[in-house]
Regions:
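Conserved acidic segment of CheY-like receiver
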Residues: 8-19, 24, 54-55
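Short amphipathic alpha-helix used as the core "switch/output" element in two-component signaling
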Residues: 66-81
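Alpha4 helix (beta4-alpha4-beta5 surface) of REC/receiver domains from two-component response regulators
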Residues: 69, 92-107, 120
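A short, hydrophobic beta-strand element within the central beta-sheet of small alpha/beta folds
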Residues: 81-92, 105
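C-terminal output helix
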Residues: 113-122
Length: 134
């Protein structure tokens, strides 16, 4: 849902670490109109308030629901079943990747991730899944 005022695609960053939030906000705003949330509660508030073109999901989100659960819930709805989701986690074991893909992420990245890899992955996933160029 690219904003008509801003020609940038809308990205929702789901990340509970404050330092990571700040970095991602500075780095990703070059190509995306982004909003950040830090919990399942604020995640659903953001979804109610705006339409997003892509989500960057912290798989290890702390709280009542982690990023895997949020991804499963999105995939179970008609409205969000095809929304591009890039999963991000510090856990790099094969079972972690398998769990993320089973939940419904389109791409799984391991923290720390190189800046250019993160940006390229978001741009490529958005274009491949939605036909939207960042």
């Amino acid at each position: 849902m690219q904003d008509s005022v801003s020609s940038k695609p809308k990205l929702l960053v789901v990340e509970d670490d404050y330092e990571n939030q700040k970095f991602l906000q500075i780095f990703l705003k070059r190509k995306f109109d982004l909003e950040i949330c830090d919990s399942a509660e604020t995640f659903y508030e953001k979804l109610d308030q705006s339409k997003f073109d892509i989500i960057l999901m912290d798989i290890s989100l702390r709280g009542k629901k982690d990023g895997l659960q949020l991804t499963r819930e999105l995939r179970a709805t008609e409205e969000y079943k095809n929304l591009p989701i890039v999963g991000l986690s510090a856990h790099a074991f094969q079972k972690d990747k398998d769990n993320a893909y089973s939940a419904g992420v389109d791409v799984f990245l391991t923290k720390p991730v190189q800046n250019d890899v993160l940006m390229d992955t978001l741009v490529k996933t958005l274009e491949e899944k939605s036909g939207i160029k960042a």
